[in-house]
Amino acid sequence: MPYMPSLSQLQQTDAFLRRHLGPDQGEQQAMLDALGLASREQLIEQTVPPAIRLQGELNLPPALDEQAALAKLKGYAEQNQLWTSLIGMGYHGTITPPVILRNVLENPGWYTAYTPYQPEIAQGRLEALLNYQQMIIDLTGLDLANASLLDEATAAAEAMTLARRMAKSKSNRFFVDENCHPQTLSVVQTRAEAFGFELVVGTLDDLAGHEVFGALLQYPDTHGEIRDLRPAIEQLHAQQALACVAADLLSLLLLTPPGELGADVVLGSTQRFGVPMGYGGPHAAYFASRDEFKRGMPGRIIGVSKDARGNTALRMALQTREQHIRREKANSNICTAQVLLANIAGFYAVYHGPQGLKRIAQRVHRLTAILAAGLEQKGIVRLNRHFFDTLTLEVGGAQTAIIESAEAAQINLRILGRGRLGVSLDETCDERTVEQLLAIFLGADHGLDVAALDAGELAAGIPAGLQRDSGYLEHPVFNSHHSETEMLRYLKQLENKDLALNQAMIPLGSCTMKLNATSEMIPITWAEFANLHPFVPRGQAQGYRLMIEELEAWLCAITGFDAISMQPNSGAQGEYAGLVAIRKYHESRGEGQRDICLIPSSAHGTNPASAQMVSMRVVIVECDKGGNVDLEDLKRKAAEAGDRLSCLMITYPSTHGVYEENVREICAAIHAQGGQVYMDGANLNAQVGLARPADIGADVSHMNLHKTFCIPHGGGGPGMGPIGVKAHLAPFVANHPVVELEGPQPGNGAVSAAPWGSASILPISWMYIAMMGPQLRDATEVAILGANYLANRLGGAFPVLYSGRNGRVAHECILDLRPLKAASGISEEDVAKRLMDYGFHAPTMSFPVPGTLMIEPTESESKAELDRFVEAMLSIRAEIAKVQDGEWPADNNPLVRAPHTLADVIGEWDRPYSIAEAVTPSAHARAHKYWPAVNRVDNVYGDRNLFCACVPVDAYRD
């Protein structure tokens, strides 16, 4: 009888690991052979300093297979209770059109793409973002919009800082209407304190008594009232201050746009444009301003330019405002924003069109008006005279009974206290919702009929002088794709223009573009995770609490920290949150004078940008010839700072792609002067299972869940940047004004709008860790193996700029193109653009060293894909040789004219190289050709001729 293995022998404890890792055991051994090594352990011994190595396995549960992990998480999800939440406060029920759900949110062609720094291979999502910007411009009545921020509260804080930069007022005081959403007020207070601004909170009537540089007003306000803001705005302008208005986007289909009222900045959330509440996020915040403030605008702006053939091409405009270029002088530390969600909101407008959107807004308003009329007939006092979708009601001693009745109907109301309740209707509401609410407030025998109320004359909720009469969304893109067939094809046309992970490796250094497994993505669209309001009673979110608590425990085990704050919803926001905690810690010890932040010259641009956001003075620490932090320079500057030293911000492994041997000594030098160590978590993918930041000496670190822990980049967001802290910093992390968190001190300000940030994407990281368990170390080791394999194979053609012990690199490596540029005139940009012709996304250009390419393969890429990349790079090196040898002119060769498009091929060809050499330079390109949508984009033209709205349809035609 043939041998039959037992069930225990057939159990696959590494089932997901084998799916996640690109190279199998045989390929890994071949890569090790190329390095002259016998095992991965030998590679790690040669690469990672012994002093920081983690002894033993990570303290994590054994790995689950995909089905078991999904089943466990589904069990958690089912403990969330899906009530009808009419709480409002900036979060509303919405309907995601299925064509958008399936073809964007659930489509790796959209969610695995990177930020469009390389516009030639990102025209699809750039067009989608331009549509989004046009939508915001039209609805707000302003001149310019960016391509999203993290959430409404963060956008409000950014508006305050823009006002300080741009207002001519000399005041240091900022006014906030007390009727703003409480979470917005808290985030603005945190930012104002960090910048040293004086914050005045009061009613609009109080504004006249204060000299300010700006003010934040809510429209409609948090209680639903619609006020004419023109008098307040005129007062602000009279004292050369800026008027910032936080506006409900759906209401602007019916209300006079704030721009027409005189507002300088308008901001808010696009959540109710088809993006689920998700227990707080992710959602794209919008941000619009007058044209004169464009160079003070935070975040990415998509602009119209032209390509080398003179055709219309889109790109990210005015990048010199941003942190990756201006560093501590940047307008903001914003890096990752909410591109995927902005695209969904923009597509929502494209699909519904202006009439469809207006119908949704009118329906919500009509339902609210019917409810208001019925309650008024029965004597319920409404505290807001005017309304769009929200009623604030005075119910006196009946409050408790009404709340109990609402709970029996599984409806959440906003409980304001002192006999006041709020109710906000939304797109998901209908006549049945109104019937339930009438019964809740009036009792079952109220005698009212919704149909009869609807048939009667209803008082207008919107003041006559604030009813919108201006047009919007007149561009053809918003009036052409209303059938599902047309929408489906439009989405596919845009997707086909872009290069994402579902087509090729994206070898961007410092970005960790690893696999975003399908099983990790599935739970985010489960209704139990997607449809919860962030301010529901905790008992209704028990599944979320269990999942988040478990994820926090796992992240503590992985990093060595004592506590985790999940609130920051990007890496840059994690930096800001960590620095705020450090500042509060020093102040608690009577050392508030500590304001110097040491930052190595190689740091990410977000580091100095974040430091300036908490009023720290940045002092740069030099690096030595080996790319390491110059220890003597660091010790000298730490000593010079003395009792003013606040912290050091350091990335580990370094942004130069090496494990610095003296990192413990670096941390000790800072601690000796009373400072704290902030470790940038951008390169955590090279530590997991091998070392832990807290053990190395870090006091606080953020974790890019959208890098190391598999949340996809989404074309520029969403992300999550929770911070880990040691016990002494735990009391000083962010709290929340609506949902008080356990651990942080009561009264600590918030750093984002929702208590747990973008909570609905946390299941992605939970799934990844659950399915990997202690085998996370394998992922780290294979990532290091891949980087060293590439460095070994490419080093002869392109020198590897920095290496660590035994000539090894960490999980990424930097190729130095400066000698080649000097010899041939071919730049790192030429090589990056030429890679597109081979079907690759470019590596990171000129960071952290100008004239270089930084490559990070991640553990998810197979040896075959790595070899294909090597072959492309070596082929490009041979092409450079032809330029050096004079075979091709320096100004007319495949590199300087890359990338090549279909328009090149079908046009007249008069170049000294063949069409085949241009567009099919490799066997893979011949078999699986990816065509960039445009030729090389003219960046200078785009900034000199700034245009950031939709262009005529004919402009996209060649």
Swiss-Prot record:
Identify one Pfam family in the record: GDC-P
Q: Entry's SUPFAM superfamilies?
A: PLP-dependent transferases
Keyword Ion transport among UniProt keywords: no
* Obligatory cofactor(s): pyridoxal 5'-phosphate
Keyword ATP-binding tagged: no
Which keywords are on file for this protein? Oxidoreductase, Pyridoxal phosphate
Q: Which reaction does it catalyse?
A: N(6)-[(R)-lipoyl]-L-lysyl-[glycine-cleavage complex H protein] + glycine + H(+) = N(6)-[(R)-S(8)-aminomethyldihydrolipoyl]-L-lysyl-[glycine-cleavage complex H protein] + CO2
GO molecular function, a single term: glycine binding
Q: Positions modified as N6-(pyridoxal phosphate)lysine?
A: K707
Instruction: Mention any one GO cellular component term assigned to this protein in its UniProt record.
Output: glycine cleavage complex
Q: What class of enzyme is it?
A: oxidoreductase
EC number of the protein: 1.4.4.2
- GO biological process terms, semicolon-separated: glycine decarboxylation via glycine cleavage system
Q: Which InterPro entries match?
A: GcvP (IPR003437), GDC-P_C (IPR049316), GDC-P_N (IPR049315), GDC_P (IPR020581), PyrdxlP-dep_Trfase (IPR015424), PyrdxlP-dep_Trfase_major (IPR015421), PyrdxlP-dep_Trfase_small (IPR015422)
UniProt subunit comment: The glycine cleavage system is composed of four proteins: P, T, L and H.
What family classification does the UniProt entry report for this protein?
A: Belongs to the GcvP family.
| Task performed by this protein | The glycine cleavage system catalyzes the degradation of glycine. The P protein binds the alpha-amino group of glycine through its pyridoxal phosphate cofactor; CO(2) is released and the remaining methylamine moiety is then transferred to the lipoamide cofactor of the H protein.
Q: Which protein are we looking at?
A: Glycine dehydrogenase (decarboxylating)
Q: Which organism is it from?
A: Stutzerimonas stutzeri (strain A1501) (Pseudomonas stutzeri)
Q: What is the lineage of its organism?
A: Bacteria, Pseudomonadati, Pseudomonadota, Gammaproteobacteria, Pseudomonadales
The encoding gene is: gcvP
